[in-house]
């Protein structure tokens, strides 16, 4: 509770305009002379013991009133004292309780209405005790309300439909790593994940020292990968029939639905004031998509309706000690799709389709994914056959977690995860069945008889955040004989190294052919030795390296080192024409997005970024 107490000659107010949280009925205008004005802002931590906070507030007001010998109190809700406000219902209840407690103590009390834009005038008496501010929190020994006890059960379901104890899967596999993390038996591993060094040493991403922790700078090579991953996600959802939108990154907490949805996420939010409005930075794209949906005229014939946004950016105020590399950030890019479904049966069908997309992303990125399916016991009992079907369709065992009761907006969800070099899960694609948000945001359609229907909504990130996808791809390189990216994601797909300056013109001709064929090719024309240039191509993880000299110029045949097929100290080399190489790379990258080089073609023009 934030409290500002002012001993005044008078206070008068007039309610001008309602907000969505407006208290009604109310006293629209009032005045109190020779009064102690108590400006109050009820804060979210007060919910831990609101009765204790009310008691402390009444005591603080009473002590001040006694010192200034004042028997009149105006309780005035004033949200601008805090950027971490409590839920409106709790705030109103607290303010009413303060009013009633003061009246019982013998004070003459008036209370300005909650949730209105109001004009007010007051005249502060100006004596040494006329102004006081207080910050009140629940006492350390306050008894917090007990959380609902939820029982969690874990077991493994196989594609054959059989149920197994999780202990049967305690081996060294990626699936076992997921199980150990979920049931709490994973052994903590020290040190930084592999990708943290790689993201900087390969000049993909760097830290930004003059920004907040967890906000990164993307360098050209990393920006290219990031953009390709975003293009890939867009192509997936367009093929699936989703319609892209773009919505704001910040929202007004005065909107009841926005506040309630944000409040479910707890304290890990960026909140701030914009003028007299309490705002938040989104932690997902659902805020803007849901407000868009509630303003639409939706017919059952439109459903399922799929809406997509590349959330650039979403913000989560993670604990500073938890922020690491690309895995856990405070600002990240989330491909986010929401599907408004006709009914639960329709939602289950869409769930299957979107889960299949999630599995596909693992294959396309070259990262092995494992899965955990979570639902309430009631949902599992009713839809066990359907759950067995999606496990069968997935073709791999899936960890099942059942909850004794629903505590989230979803009744069922699946999380797919890659496993990093330290045997820890990196959660990426997800699909969730949301049965709360349509009601909260007023998203509805009408049946022929006029009945209102608040339909289920699927939340789906087909890839997971772009940063975590890249994290998983980099972590996966520890499992490769020679570290490499999928060719369609490699910043330089082909590097041409002329033996001498006499071969530079021929190298440029090859590079031009490759570029016209939508292949990213550069030329190492620097004044370095041939061996140093070859090592540099390896350090840059170039997919195909061509050294051109007299033999290549005369024959037209190129000797090409293929990184993905090489072994340590044993490069895999093939001989082919430029046309054949173009055909090979075309087949390898078919169906994947393309962007040109983000760095100069001639390496002599490329600066170092780190």
UniProtKB/Swiss-Prot annotation:
Stretches for region Editing domain: 1-144
Cellular component annotations (GO), alphabetically ordered: cytoplasm
Keyword Zinc belongs to the record: yes
Cofactors, names only: Zn(2+)
Stored InterPro entries: aa-tRNA-synt_IIb, aa-tRNA-synth_II, aa-tRNA-synth_II/BPL/LPL, Anticodon-bd, Anticodon-bd_dom_sf, DTD-like_sf, Thr-tRNA-ligase_IIa, Threonyl-tRNA_syn_edit_dom_arc
Keywords of the record: Aminoacyl-tRNA synthetase, ATP-binding, Cytoplasm, Ligase, Metal-binding, Nucleotide-binding, Protein biosynthesis, RNA-binding, tRNA-binding, Zinc
Compartments in which it is found: Cytoplasm
GO BP field: threonyl-tRNA aminoacylation
Region called Catalytic, residue ranges: 194-486
Enzyme Commission number(s) of this protein: 6.1.1.3
Enzymatic reactions: tRNA(Thr) + L-threonine + ATP = L-threonyl-tRNA(Thr) + AMP + diphosphate + H(+)
Bound cofactor: record note: Binds 1 zinc ion per subunit.
Binding sites annotated in the UniProt record for Zn(2+): 286, 338, 459
Transmembrane segments: none
Signal peptide residue numbers: none
Keyword ATP-binding on entry: yes
Assigned protein family: Belongs to the class-II aminoacyl-tRNA synthetase family.
Classification via HAMAP family: Thr_tRNA_synth
Role: Catalyzes the attachment of threonine to tRNA(Thr) in a two-step reaction: L-threonine is first activated by ATP to form Thr-AMP and then transferred to the acceptor end of tRNA(Thr). Also edits incorrectly charged L-seryl-tRNA(Thr).
Full protein name: Threonine--tRNA ligase
Organism listed in the record: Methanospirillum hungatei JF-1 (strain ATCC 27890 / DSM 864 / NBRC 100397 / JF-1)
Organism classification: Archaea, Methanobacteriati, Methanobacteriota, Stenosarchaea group, Methanomicrobia
């Amino acid at each position: 509770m934030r409290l500002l107490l002012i001993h005044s000659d008078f206070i008068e107010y007039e309610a001008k305009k309602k907000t969505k949280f407006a208290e009604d009925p109310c006293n629209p205008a009032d005045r109190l002379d020779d009064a102690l004005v108590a400006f109050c802002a009820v804060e979210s931590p007060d919910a831990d013991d609101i009765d204790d906070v009310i008691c402390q507030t009444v005591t603080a007001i009473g002590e001040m009133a006694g010192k200034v010998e004042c028997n009149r109190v105006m309780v005035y809700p004033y949200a601008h004292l805090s950027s971490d406000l409590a839920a409106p219902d709790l705030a109103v209840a607290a303010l009413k309780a303060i009013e009633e407690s003061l009246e019982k103590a013998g004070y003459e009390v008036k209370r300005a209405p909650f949730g209105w834009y109001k004009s007010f005038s007051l005249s502060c008496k100006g004596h040494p005790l006329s102004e006081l501010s207080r910050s009140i929190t629940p006492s350390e020994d306050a008894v917090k309300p007990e959380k609902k006890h939820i029982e969690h059960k874990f077991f493994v379901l196989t594609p054959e439909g059989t149920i197994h104890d999780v202990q049967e899967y305690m081996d060294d596999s990626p699936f076992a790593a997921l199980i150990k993390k979920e049931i709490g038996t994973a052994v903590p591993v020290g040190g930084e994940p592999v990708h943290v060094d790689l993201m900087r040493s390969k000049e993909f991403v760097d830290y930004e020292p003059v920004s907040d922790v967890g906000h990164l700078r993307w360098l050209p090579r990393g920006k290219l990968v990031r953009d390709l991953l975003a293009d890939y996600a867009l192509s997936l959802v367009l093929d699936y029939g989703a319609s892209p939108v773009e919505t704001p990154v910040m929202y007004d907490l005065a909107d009841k639905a926005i506040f309630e949805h944000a409040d479910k996420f707890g304290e890990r939010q960026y909140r701030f004031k914009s003028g007299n409005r309490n705002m938040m930075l989104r932690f997902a794209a659902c805020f803007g998509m849901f407000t868009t949906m509630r303003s639409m005229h939706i017919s059952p014939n439109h459903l399922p309706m799929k809406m997509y946004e590349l959330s650039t950016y979403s913000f989560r105020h993670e604990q500073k000690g938890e922020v690491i590399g690309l895995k856990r950030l405070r600002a990240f890019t989330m491909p986010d799709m929401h599907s408004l479904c006709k009914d639960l049966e329709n939602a289950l069908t869409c769930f299957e389709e979107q889960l299949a997309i999630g599995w596909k992303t693992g294959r396309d990125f070259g990262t092995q994914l494992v899965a955990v399916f979570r639902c309430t016991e009631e949902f599992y009992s009713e839809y066990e056959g359907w759950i067995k079907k999606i496990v069968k369709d997935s073709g791999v065992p899936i960890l099942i977690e059942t909850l004794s009761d629903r505590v989230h907006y979803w009744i069922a969800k699946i999380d797919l995860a890659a496993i990093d070099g330290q045997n820890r899960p990196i959660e990426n694609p997800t699909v969730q069945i949301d049965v709360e948000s349509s009601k909260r945001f007023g998203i509805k359609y009408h049946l022929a008889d006029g009945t209102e229907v608040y339909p289920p909504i699927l939340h789906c990130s087909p890839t997971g955040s772009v940063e975590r996808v890249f994290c998983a791809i980099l972590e996966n390189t520890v499992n490769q004989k020679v570290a490499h990216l999928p060719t369609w994601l490699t910043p330089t797909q082909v590097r041409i190294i002329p033996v001498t300056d006499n071969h530079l013109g021929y190298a440029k001709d090859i590079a031009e052919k490759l570029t016209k064929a939508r292949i990213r090719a550069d030329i190492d024309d620097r004044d370095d030795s041939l061996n140093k240039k070859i090592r540099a191509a390896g350090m840059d993880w170039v997919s195909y390296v061509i050294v051109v000299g007299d033999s290549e110029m005369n024959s037209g045949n190129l000797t090409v080192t293929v990184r993905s097929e090489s072994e340590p100290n044993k490069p895999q080399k093939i001989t082919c024409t430029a046309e054949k190489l173009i055909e090979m790379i075309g087949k390898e990258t078919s169906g994947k997005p393309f962007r040109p080089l983000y760095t100069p073609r001639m390496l002599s023009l490329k600066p170092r970024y780190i």
